[in-house]
């Protein structure tokens, strides 16, 4: 308000100086006053910019508001919504997937570490074909039967893209950052980032919604906060492949669209005849940008 008041005074003084100039009246004192006003405005604008930046940074650190249906609490308050199928009794002690993959010669961590360091893997032969087949199966299911539009997005994104999805500034430590002489880019942690921002800064007609996108991409995460967590096998890798579903919808339809998206994901597990459970995460176990998560 103070800055606007000084700017208003400056505009009025400019008109007064012009008027006095036409009347051949002395404007020395008024010009001297306006010089002081201009200096005050510059000083206040710098202070205002600093305060606005600090306020913006604080607001960017605020998480999304949990939906009323979300249980309050930490991970112990997570709620099992439903269970589908039962695990088959194997009659023997199963191996960890990492050990099994290594024994079959389709998964190799040691050679990946030689190439890239820890938390990378190479898939060999049938392992590579299996992953490729699963990816194609999911893409075909979602595009041909569930109405999603397949997108191949960029794997490198601008900082403002990650700002728009809530990854920056809070989770910068979890991202891989690249730098060139002309710009700063980040490797995507999930296809959700570029898909969500496809229509950023656009006004969409309600009749176009919902928009349903599916994308297969590699994902890159530093997993800086995973110390002490299970990192065996293919868990918490720096690079992994994922088929992502994203919907853009009006806020009043978002919960229905979420339930539909959960159903779409469940269909994959049903057709693969894998037993599973759907868990509603508690507020303390949800992601920073989520209002409701299964």
Describe the residue ranges of each PLM region.
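N-terminal alpha-helical targeting/anchoring segments
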Residues: 1-88
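TRNA-recognition modules of translation machinery and tRNA-sensing kinases, especially anticodon-binding
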Residues: 83-294
């Amino acid at each position: 308000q103070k800055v606007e008041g000084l700017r208003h005074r400056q505009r009025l003084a400019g008109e007064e100086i012009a008027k006095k100039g036409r009347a051949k009246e002395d404007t020395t004192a008024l010009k001297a006053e306006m010089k002081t006003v201009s200096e005050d405005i510059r000083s206040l604008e710098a202070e205002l910019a600093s305060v606005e930046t600090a306020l913006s940074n604080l607001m960017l650190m605020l998480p999304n508001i949990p939906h009323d249906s979300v249980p309050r609490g930490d991970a112990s308050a997570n709620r099992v919504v439903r269970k589908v199928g039962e695990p088959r009794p194997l009659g023997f002690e199963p191996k960890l997937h990492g050990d099994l993959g290594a024994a079959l010669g389709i998964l190799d961590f040691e050679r990946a570490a030689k190439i890239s360091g820890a938390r990378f893997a190479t898939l060999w032969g049938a392992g590579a074909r299996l992953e490729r087949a699963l990816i194609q199966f999911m893409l075909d299911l979602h595009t041909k039967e569930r109405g999603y539009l397949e997108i191949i997005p960029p794997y490198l994104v601008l900082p403002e893209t990650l700002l728009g999805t809530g990854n920056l500034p809070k989770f910068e430590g979890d991202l891989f950052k690249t730098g060139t002489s002309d710009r700063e880019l980040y490797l995507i942690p999930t296809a959700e980032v570029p898909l969500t921002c496809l229509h950023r800064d656009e006004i969409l007609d309600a009749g176009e919604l919902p928009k349903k996108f599916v994308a297969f991409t590699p994902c890159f995460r530093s997993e800086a906060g995973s110390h002490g967590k299970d990192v065996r096998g293919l868990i918490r890798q720096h690079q992994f492949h994922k088929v992502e579903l994203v919907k853009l919808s009006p806020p009043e339809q978002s919960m229905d669209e979420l339930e539909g998206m959960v159903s779409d994901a469940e269909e994959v597990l049903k057709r693969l005849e894998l037993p599973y459970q759907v868990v509603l995460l508690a507020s303390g176990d949800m992601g920073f940008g989520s209002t409701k998560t299964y």
